[in-house]
Regions:
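Pair of pore-lining "gating" transmembrane helices in MFS-fold secondary transporters
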Residues: 2-27, 195-196
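Residue-level signature of mid-helix packing/kink "hotspots" within the transmembrane helices
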Residues: 23, 51-61, 146-147
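Extracellular/periplasmic helix-loop-helix junction of adjacent transmembrane segments
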Residues: 28-57
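Conserved MFS/SLC helix-loop-helix module at the cytosolic interface between two early adjacent transmembrane helices
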Residues: 57-94
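Paired small-residue
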Residues: 98-106
Length: 196
């Protein structure tokens, strides 16, 4: 593998480590429930469940439609900035569960864009057995990211539950790595038939 592709992988794997950023609230779900005792526990659990996942799916559909006009690198970076800002917003806006759920929804949009575009970058630059190998390592970095985000979140949230969301500021490091290392990616051909 040449140096250029190794550089691309550094950017792709940096993005992969942030895909599980939606797990930041996992260690503090009980504390969030205690902070909003009048809210249904199922609603509290939505900060890590259905809301960010559904929004991620929506973002994947939209980003694949934009792939003929917007580079995959830009999609990844914009998605990642959205995740960071939405997550960090809970440090300020945490007076109601609705605010936390709204932040989770916006994070889901960003995460969907990041995942879809990084998967597509792998397809653009790696083929055959090399692609299978790269995807296997990619999955490892996604899992490693999940471990890191939950560990950092648990430490930060030990005093106040919403302090866990400061973990999203760590993403600045990954965004810089992506900006330096990610390739633009190939624009997808415009589709004549609308899949919707």
């Amino acid at each position: 593998m040449d140096k250029t592709k190794i550089k691309y992988l550094v950017g792709i794997y940096a993005a992969a480590m942030c895909i599980m950023g939606m797990l930041v609230p996992v260690p503090i779900v009980a504390s969030v429930a205690a902070a909003f005792p009048n809210e249904n526990i199922a609603a509290v659990q939505m900060i890590i469940g259905i809301i960010p996942l559904m929004m991620a799916l929506s973002a994947m559909l939209v980003s694949s439609q934009l792939a003929s006009r917007v580079s995959k690198k830009k999609t990844t970076l914009v998605g990642h900035v959205i995740v960071m800002l939405a997550g960090a917003s809970v440090l300020v806006f945490h007076d109601s569960l609705g605010q936390v759920l709204a932040a989770s929804a916006v994070m889901g949009l960003g995460l969907g864009a990041v995942q879809n575009s990084t998967d597509a970058l792998i397809a653009d630059y790696f083929g055959g057995k090399q692609r299978s190998f790269v995807m296997g390592i990619y999955s490892t970095f996604v899992a490693l990211g999940g471990i890191i985000w939950t560990m950092v979140s648990g430490i930060l949230g030990s005093a106040e539950w919403f302090h866990s969301y400061a973990a999203y500021f760590i993403m600045i490091i990954f965004i810089v790595i992506e900006a330096v290392c990610l390739p633009e990616g190939h624009l997808e051909p415009k589709r004549k038939v609308n899949v919707f």
